[in-house]
């Protein structure tokens, strides 16, 4: 009887990507940072909630900074060096997230605002009276 080959678990090869796109979605309640390759395949992502902020603290610029830092560190393990920033939404963490990506060691080549603006589409929610 021939010796049986033991099934060895396959090691997943890390994708080595030089440049990518950082999608920053900043809402009034949270900030999401997704870093993708040029084709749009996600390499890493983080949000203010996944970094450990809860409730109203998620909407702060500091939370956005921490989320961007976490996503950048994860992406730099794949060899990422340069990103284009696509910023969407009206939130407080827009600039903080971009600055944090630069501080983490990523070179930001382009900053583009891709906030969707309606040509008078849906009716917006009513104004708050506090």
Swiss-Prot record:
Database matches in Pfam families: Ribosomal_S11
HAMAP family assigned to the protein according to its UniProt record, in alphabetical order: Ribosomal_uS11
Subunit structure of this chain's protein: Part of the 30S ribosomal subunit. Interacts with proteins S7 and S18. Binds to IF-3.
GO molecular function, one term: rRNA binding
Family classification: Belongs to the universal ribosomal protein uS11 family.
Protein name per UniProt: Small ribosomal subunit protein uS11
Swiss-Prot/TrEMBL keywords: Ribonucleoprotein, Ribosomal protein, RNA-binding, rRNA-binding
């Amino acid at each position: 009887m021939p010796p049986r080959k033991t099934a060895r678990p396959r090691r997943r090869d890390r994708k080595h990507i030089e440049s990518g796109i950082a999608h920053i979605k900043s809402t009034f309640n949270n900030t999401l940072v997704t870093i993708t390759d040029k084709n749009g395949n996600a390499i890493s992502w983080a949000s203010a909630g996944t970094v450990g902020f809860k409730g109203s603290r998620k909407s702060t610029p500091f939370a956005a900074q921490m989320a961007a830092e976490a996503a950048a560190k994860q992406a730099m393990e794949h060899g990422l060096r340069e990103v284009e920033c696509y910023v969407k939404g009206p939130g407080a963490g827009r600039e903080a997230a971009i600055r944090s990506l630069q501080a983490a060691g990523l070179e930001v080549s382009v900053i583009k605002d891709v906030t969707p603006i309606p040509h008078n589409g849906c009716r917006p929610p009513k104004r708050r009276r506090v």
